[in-house]
Amino acid sequence: KDTLYITHEEAEAKPGKNVRIIHGPFAGITGKLHRARGGYYFIKTLAGVGVMMRISRWYCEVTE
């Protein structure tokens, strides 16, 4: 329901910070954090497709 699929180009075109998820079942995965639609979304690109999941920003740490 809160998962959106976007292309690799769409994921790279948006400004965002590189982050690592530090809590929950996705802990350790790195990607980008974006703010959209009044919430925070974690973006991970796999095989040329971006997956955007709603996440609390407190579950992420900046890796830049």
Feature-to-residue mapping (PLM):
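Ferredoxin-like alpha/beta domains used as RNA- or RNAP-binding modules
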Residues: 1-64
